[in-house]
Amino acid sequence: EKMLRIIDPSTDLRDRLPSISTAVAPIGSLLPNIAHELGLPSGIPVAPGGGDNMMSAIGTGNVISGVVTMSLGTSGTIFSYSQTPVIDPQGNIAAFCSSTGGWLPLICTMNCTTAMERMRELFDTDLGSLERNLSAADRGAGGIVTVPFFTGERTPDLPNGKACMFGLDSQNMRQENFLRSAIEGVTFGLRNGLKLLTAQDIPAERIVLTGGGANSPT
């Protein structure tokens, strides 16, 4: 209410806004035309829901302690359910609320599938060729190490960070090694995020993948 008064002290903005509801409280029912379009029963309850990661948590069973969701999209997010707020003194963990009445401590890396897209563009390769190259390369990518900060980085906090490749020589400069090295760099960034979560005594008994990157067989 205080914030609304600051925005416009001349009127009560509460009259201009919808009522506040919880993520799971029914606020209406599915209209027949929309139900037909979606292939769902007409009249089923509709609730406000929540943000993308909050809904991913529900969809991956991340509603109890011990489950960690790893979302592989443009950015990479790693989060877990907690019954109490998790406050990270270093500021790496976002202290989000969940949509199920608890909290959702979350780590975000800026470069996940976007790093692989940059590499695919560089080599003008499609997803099928990418998968074959990743399978053909050995672990360690022949010694090539990629720091995949193509868009800076949030975790660690390096907004002006740049992507780099190390360890190139005349023996390992093959397409499959470059691609493998990029995905290994992304993976180590996610691993670092998981370590930051578990360092706050967040248990990781089960990890569930979601997001576009989760469709990759490799």
What does each of the following model-derived ranges do?
Residues 1-11, 26-218:
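Active-site core segments that coordinate phosphate-bearing ligands/cofactors
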Residues 16, 22-25:
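Domain-core and long-helix interface of multi-subunit machines
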Residues 17-18, 39:
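Active-site beta-strand/loop segments that form the cofactor-binding cradle
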